């Protein structure tokens, strides 16, 4: 099982806060929004994670998360050259996913509960997708 965190978009509705970086790095309770996504995946024993980056501040995302080791995960960065939607971003992960099941997080969404049961039901289930 692998994880994908979408970290794209321009964050225009949050300007001027997003003039210099992505909205997913804006802090909520002293940590970036997308860190909650990463921690949810790790808590569910998903440690192979791709972060889709693109637009302003991609380098800041890479600087903050690095290779993922300080969070106990392995990170792969995948560039999305222009915002073409969620389906396009996920399609860029084809090689990373390598026919495994995967969970997608939008980097600016915070789920304040464990995803472990959801993940286990998906892994054990005989279906292609779960929402």
For each of these PLM feature ranges, what is it?
Residues 2-5, 13, 27, 31-106, ...:
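Conserved N-terminal catalytic core of the sugar/cofactor nucleotidyltransferase
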Residues 19-24:
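Short alpha-helical oligomerization interface
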Residues 113-131:
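Conserved donor-nucleotide/metal-binding helix-loop-beta segment in metal-dependent transferases, i.e.
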């Amino acid at each position: 099982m692998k994880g994908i965190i979408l970290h794209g978009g321009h964050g225009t509705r949050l300007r001027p806060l997003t003039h210099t970086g992505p909205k997913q790095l804006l802090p909520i309770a002293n940590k970036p929004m997308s860190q909650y996504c990463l921690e949810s995946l790790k808590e569910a024993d998903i440690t192979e994670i791709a972060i889709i980056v693109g637009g302003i501040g991609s380098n800041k995302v890479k600087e903050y998360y690095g290779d993922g080791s300080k969070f106990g995960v392995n990170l792969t960065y995948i560039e999305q050259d222009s915002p073409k939607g969620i389906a396009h971003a996920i399609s860029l992960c084809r090689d990373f996913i390598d026919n495994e099941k995967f969970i997608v997080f939008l980097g600016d969404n915070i789920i304040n509960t464990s995803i472990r049961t959801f993940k286990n039901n998906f892994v054990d289930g005989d279906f292609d997708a779960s929402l």
